[in-house]
């Protein structure tokens, strides 16, 4: 499962688990509940607030799945349309549940976009790179987050899609296989190849940076 890699990746991408105190969580939940009520009433101001608060984060999600800005924009737009049309199905389950619901819709729209373009392939090119030993891990030390994300964006589409679902969406290879209509071992292979390509990109990046100071 390469759990060490996932832990390293999430930590060095500077994602932090911050536990708010009880009062802060209550205030956040209350604010979200009021917003949801207004969204259900289709109040324009509420939808503008929702877009302002979450569009940046969701645009970032879109850009992890597709390389072209125009495609990311289309996915984001379709995601908000889907949210507007399906808000009645949303069930509030506490702080963070609204964001989770929106992210889930955005990821689904990204996958839909990729499938419609017909650009996703489950084929594995064995000569893409040398085999990477299972124990070798990606060393993200001292690499800016945006550089890491750019490396992910430049992965072949199949590798990138599987990598995103496994690492960021925390899907199992069995779940990914169902989502993408591929074999479970194909998902695992594509993740392994994605990891290998990232390791090579990171090595090249560090070598390039080191050469600048010599």
What do these predicted ranges mean?
Residues 1-56, 153, 174-175, 207, ...:
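N-terminal module of bacterial RNA polymerase sigma factors
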Residues 40-49, 59-78, 184, 206-209, ...:
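Short, charged helix-capping/linker segments at alpha-helix termini
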Residues 40-41, 80-95, 116-117:
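Sigma70-family region 2
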Residues 53-56, 64-65, 164-171:
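Short helix-capping/turn signature of helix-turn-helix
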Residues 60, 74-81, 96-108:
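Structural recognition of an alpha-helix C-terminal capping motif at a helix-to-coil junction
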Residues 89, 103-124:
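Arg/Lys-rich amphipathic alpha helix in sigma70-family domain 2
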Residues 111, 159, 168, 179-207:
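DNA-recognition helix of helix-turn-helix
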Residues 112, 120-145:
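Internal acidic/polar
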């Amino acid at each position: 499962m390469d759990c060490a890699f996932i832990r390293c990746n999430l930590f060095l991408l500077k994602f932090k688990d911050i536990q708010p105190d009880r009062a802060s969580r209550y205030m956040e939940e209350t604010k979200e509940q009021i917003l949801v009520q207004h969204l259900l009433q289709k109040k324009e101001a509420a939808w503008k607030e929702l877009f302002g608060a979450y569009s940046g984060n969701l645009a970032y999600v879109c850009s992890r799945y597709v390389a072209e800005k125009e495609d990311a924009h289309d996915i984001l737009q379709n995601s908000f349309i889907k949210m507007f049309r399906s808000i009645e199905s949303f069930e509030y389950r506490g702080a963070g549940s609204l964001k989770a619901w929106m992210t889930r819709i955005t990821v689904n729209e990204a996958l839909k976009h990729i499938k419609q373009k017909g650009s996703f392939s489950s084929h594995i090119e064995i000569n893409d790179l040398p085999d990477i030993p299972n124990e070798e891990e990606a060393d993200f030390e001292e690499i800016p987050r945006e550089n890491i994300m750019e490396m992910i964006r430049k992965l072949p589409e199949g590798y990138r899609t599987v990598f995103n679902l496994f690492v960021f969406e925390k899907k199992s290879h069995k779940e990914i296989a169902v989502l993408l209509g591929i074999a479970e071992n194909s998902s695992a292979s594509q993740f392994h190849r994605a990891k290998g390509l990232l390791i090579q990109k990171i090595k090249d990046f560090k070598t390039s940076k080191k050469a600048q100071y010599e």
